A protein has these predicted regions:
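Short glycine-rich, Thr/Ser-proximal phosphate-binding strand/loop in the N-terminal lobe
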Residues: 9-50, 92-99
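Conserved Rossmann-like nucleotide-binding pocket used by diverse enzymes
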Residues: 5, 27, 68
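Short glycine-aspartate micro-motif
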Residues: 2-8, 71-76
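Glycine-rich phosphate-binding/catalytic subdomain of phosphoryl-transfer
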Residues: 56-138
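Generic short beta-strand
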Residues: 4, 16-17, 84
Length: 138
């Protein structure tokens, strides 16, 4: 029988589901992790937490279901919105990730908006305003 793995790497934890082709849930597992707030309005996480939680929940789901890995026909993955993971030339993470809800880039948003000729001009150019949660200001 075909099975499908769904992995949601969220802000507070990772949830993994194993389902059958008809949508019936066969197994599920969740692993939570902390959110660092080093200053008011700042939110960060170590991306290693996401990886460890993903490995843990996939292993738990596969072990509890006794489904063979070869029977998993596809993997669906969703992750946090607009987080920035900064890496060096070798691909190593160099600092905690700035999350989608991090608000430290208000000054950068103002600078981008001004450089574009104002809010309306920026929206006309890229179809969005500069917001603290988006990638460009980070």
């Amino acid at each position: 029988m075909s099975h499908y793995l769904g992995i949601d790497i969220g802000t507070s934890g990772t949830k993994t589901l194993l389902i059958q082709a008809d949508g019936k849930i066969v197994a599920e597992a969740t692993a939570e992790y902390p959110l660092a707030q080093p200053r008011p309005g700042w939110t960060e996480q170590d991306p290693e937490l996401w990886w460890n939680a993903t490995v843990k929940t996939v292993n738990e789901v596969m072990a509890s279901s006794k489904v063979k890995p070869a029977d998993v026909k596809a993997i669906g993955l969703s992750g946090q919105m607009h987080g920035s993971v900064f890496v060096d030339k070798q691909g190593n993470v160099i600092r905690p990730a700035l999350l989608w809800n991090d608000q430290r880039t208000a000054a950068e948003c103002d600078e981008i908006t001004s450089a574009a000729g104002g809010r309306k001009a920026l929206i006309k150019m890229v179809a969005n305003p500069a917001l603290t949660g988006f990638q460009a200001p980070k």
